[in-house]
């Protein structure tokens, strides 16, 4: 564990009881908490939002906050402060969330509503150019001919931050499992910056703060390059990161070699967590100090996994990039 921070006591340690949901530390790390909505809360939430189809949430953005309020009210208004406290806490910053009884692809619309409610209790999800909505759903199959590693099943998708090739601030990332068939492997991979044993070395390197060019492939529907450094700091001077190996474009030999060594140092870290995410569950992480990726799948001709993502900004705190706006 890096000396910059240590895992601190949190709400889980205090034995506090919550209304409408439970909270426990995960098996993988005390930094990752598991939040489960009770069967009653789930049932009441879905009943109260049934009048709005997903299309209504797409067309009327204020409804995304309305469904969030409904969920928080069902949890005695304990949910929103807990989410914010956890995600903004450097010692944690990650949740694995599920709702009892929501675990089948036939409930895909209900999954989108639930994830939308949670996300809009902490901020607002950004427009996703790949899908043209505030969320994106995409499928991983046994054969893939796309232009990035997002849908390629038989290789590791390396650890990275989201939002590196767009100008919008990306404070959080939400990744939900909607469907899974004939699937072995493919766990989510997570790495907290303060558990990365090489952080000090790379954060203090002269290239860490040099603005670099990030460019996305055609499938992302983003044509404008953006420039920013790989590392920045938060309000307290602690390292945060905006990095993805696929889309950073080194301008010269020096940058290329450094980025290659950086990638190797991340991928070989002993601090990487392997987290199974069953259908209906979703990860919600602070994108500034958690990196995420995906392990490889075992090949199968009928392999299928459908995912939903949302990524956006925290509405209850200034963003954490301090030196490069």
UniProtKB/Swiss-Prot annotation:
Signal sequence annotation:
none
What SUPFAM superfamilies does the database record attribute to this sequence? Clavaminate synthase-like
Q: Output the InterPro entries linked to this UniProt entry.
A: GlaH, TauD-like_sf
Q: Which reaction does it catalyse?
A: glutarate + 2-oxoglutarate + O2 = (S)-2-hydroxyglutarate + succinate + CO2
Which keywords annotate this record?
Answer: Dioxygenase, Iron, Metal-binding, Oxidoreductase
Please give the Gene Ontology molecular function terms for this protein: ferrous iron binding; glutarate dioxygenase activity; oxidoreductase activity, acting on paired donors, with incorporation or reduction of molecular oxygen, with 2-oxoglutarate as one donor, and the other dehydrogenated
Q: In which pathway does it act?
A: Amino-acid degradation
According to the lineage, what is the superkingdom? Bacteria
Q: What does this protein do?
A: Acts as an alpha-ketoglutarate-dependent dioxygenase catalyzing hydroxylation of glutarate (GA) to L-2-hydroxyglutarate (L2HG). Functions in a L-lysine degradation pathway that proceeds via cadaverine, glutarate and L-2-hydroxyglutarate.
**Its family?**
Belongs to the glutarate hydroxylase family.
Subunit text? Homotetramer.
Question: What is the recorded name of this protein?
Answer: Glutarate 2-hydroxylase
The organism is Escherichia coli O17:K52:H18 (strain UMN026 / ExPEC)
Q: What is the lineage of its organism?
A: Bacteria, Pseudomonadati, Pseudomonadota, Gammaproteobacteria, Enterobacterales
């Amino acid at each position: 564990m890096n000396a910059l921070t240590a895992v601190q006591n949190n709400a889980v340690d205090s034995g506090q009881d919550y209304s409408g949901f439970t909270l426990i530390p995960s098996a993988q790390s005390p930094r990752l908490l598991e939040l489960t909505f009770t069967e009653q809360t789930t049932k009441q939430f879905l009943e109260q939002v049934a009048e709005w189809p997903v299309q209504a949430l797409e067309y009327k953005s204020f409804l995304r906050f309305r469904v969030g309020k409904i969920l928080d009210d069902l949890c005695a208004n304990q949910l929103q402060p807990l989410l914010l406290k956890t995600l903004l806490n450097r010692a944690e910053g990650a949740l694995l969330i599920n709702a009892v009884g929501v675990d089948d692809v036939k409930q895909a619309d209900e999954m989108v509503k639930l994830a939308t409610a949670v996300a809009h209790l902490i901020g607002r999800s950004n427009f996703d150019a790949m899908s043209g909505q505030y969320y994106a759903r995409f499928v991983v199959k046994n054969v893939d001919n796309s232009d990035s590693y997002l849908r390629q099943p038989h290789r590791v998708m390396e650890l990275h931050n989201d939002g590196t090739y767009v100008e919008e601030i990306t404070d959080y990332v939400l990744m939900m499992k909607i469907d899974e068939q004939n699937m072995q492997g493919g766990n989510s991979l997570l790495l907290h910056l303060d558990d990365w044993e090489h952080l000090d070395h790379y954060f203090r390197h002269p290239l860490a703060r040099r603005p670099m060019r990030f460019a996305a492939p055609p499938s992302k529907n983003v044509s404008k390059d953006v420039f920013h450094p790989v590392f920045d700091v938060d309000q307290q001077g602690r390292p945060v990161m905006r990095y993805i190996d696929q889309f950073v474009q080194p301008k010269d030999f020096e940058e290329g070699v450094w980025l290659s060594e950086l990638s190797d140092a991340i991928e070989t870290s002993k601090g990487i967590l392997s987290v199974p995410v069953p259908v209906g569950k979703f990860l919600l992480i602070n994108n500034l100090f958690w990196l995420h990726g995906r392990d490889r799948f075992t090949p199968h001709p009928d392999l299928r996994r459908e995912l939903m993502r949302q990524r956006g900004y925290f509405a209850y705190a200034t963003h954490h990039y301090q030196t490069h706006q």
